[in-house]
Amino acid sequence: MSFDIHWSNLESDTRLNESIKNHLNTYLESISLPSYVCNLRILDFSLGKTAPNITLREISDPLDELYRGLNEDEPDSITPSPNDIQFLVEVEYKGDLLVTLAADLVLNYPSDNFMTLPVKLTISNVGLHSLCLVAHLSKHLLISFLCDISDVDLDGNESLLDPKGHVLSPRRSLERISIIRNMKIETEIGQQHSGEGSVLRSVGRLEQFLLEIFKDLLRKEVSWPSWIELDFNDDNEEDLQQSKDTPTTANTGTTTTN
């Protein structure tokens, strides 16, 4: 069963895009960069106007592992509720998501940090086709990718995945899931925006490193047994407090009470 998403509401949500950008920057700060790259950060992030195609495959009770994972971080134990639910969905995305990054390329010869060059990277044409879990538990929304799904448009000769079968198995033993199957990276090195110096484009070594960073990020953060967790408890508490502090005004101009 397929269903539509009001993607325009997400795409136009500047707070959501900013939150995703901040999360990615936090991850970039935690990784070890090679000696020739420093100060890697995300300048801009946009979900794009193209929505993913989502197909519902199964509805069930949430896995026990999800409750155990939440209870490790929650002061109050979360127990199964009749309102808890889990969806197994197929997600296909070939859209116009756009990420702009900046970094400094370092030349360490004849001495350390002998020269640095500004680098700008633009990521676009992202493609993925995966099976994932979406679970709702006590005002928590959990999302975890399980495996990649065979896709004629994404399974090229350069794919890290074995195209035999409907669900792909990785050619490299440590890569059971790739999530991002297609991605375009454009690299510019030099003072293009200030109008000084020359600009180098398509620096393959740096582009390959960035590709591996994003694949590692997704595998560590959103592929099973890890997941994305969205907690709505704080938002509800803030809304409740605001409703208590702010009087409600009717159309006639009179103030109504509780």
From Swiss-Prot:
Residue ranges, compositional bias (Low complexity): 246-258
Ranges where the record places region Disordered: 238-258
The SMP-LTD domain, residue ranges: 1-233
InterPro entries: Mdm12, MMM1_dom, SMP_LBD
Bilayer topology annotation: Peripheral membrane protein
Subcellular location: Mitochondrion outer membrane; Endoplasmic reticulum membrane
Primary localisation category: mitochondrion
Classification via PROSITE patterns: SMP
Gene Ontology biological process terms, A to Z: mitochondrial genome maintenance; mitochondrion-endoplasmic reticulum membrane tethering; phospholipid transport; protein insertion into mitochondrial outer membrane
DNA-binding recorded as keyword: no
One of the Pfam families matching this protein, by short name: MMM1
Keywords: Endoplasmic reticulum, Lipid transport, Lipid-binding, Membrane, Mitochondrion, Mitochondrion outer membrane, Transport
GO terms under cellular component: endoplasmic reticulum membrane; ERMES complex
GO MF entry, a single one: lipid binding
Superkingdom assignment: Eukaryota
HAMAP family registered for this protein in UniProt: Mdm12 (MF_03104)
Family: Belongs to the MDM12 family.
Domain notes: The SMP-LTD domain is a barrel-like domain that can bind various types of glycerophospholipids in its interior and mediate their transfer between two adjacent bilayers.
Function: Component of the ERMES/MDM complex, which serves as a molecular tether to connect the endoplasmic reticulum (ER) and mitochondria. Components of this complex are involved in the control of mitochondrial shape and protein biogenesis, and function in nonvesicular lipid trafficking between the ER and mitochondria. MDM12 is required for the interaction of the ER-resident membrane protein MMM1 and the outer mitochondrial membrane-resident beta-barrel protein MDM10.
Subunit structure: Component of the ER-mitochondria encounter structure (ERMES) or MDM complex, composed of MMM1, MDM10, MDM12 and MDM34. A MMM1 homodimer associates with one molecule of MDM12 on each side in a pairwise head-to-tail manner, and the SMP-LTD domains of MMM1 and MDM12 generate a continuous hydrophobic tunnel for phospholipid trafficking.
Protein name as catalogued: Mitochondrial distribution and morphology protein 12
